[in-house]
Amino acid sequence: MKIKIRLFGTLGNKFPEHDPIKGFEVEIQEDSTVNDLINKMGISQSKIGIISINGKLVTPLKKLKKGDFVRMFQPIFGG
């Protein structure tokens, strides 16, 4: 199934097909979770701070559905 993903901060630098405004589509198996998506993309869990699906905050255990729009933000820190 296809989902759309948009990566914020430096998360998108690893993916040349990532459009910083529109994101990009990813093919993933049915019944996959956000964690499965993260693993498939090769992103370290420590690099992700906030995850949302269709505008709602979720955990990595959330199941994905066809057409979902996933946004991932790197951790926010500073002094």
Where are these regions (language model features)?
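Ubiquitin-like/PB1-type beta-grasp interaction modules and other compact soluble beta-rich domains
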Residues: M1-G78
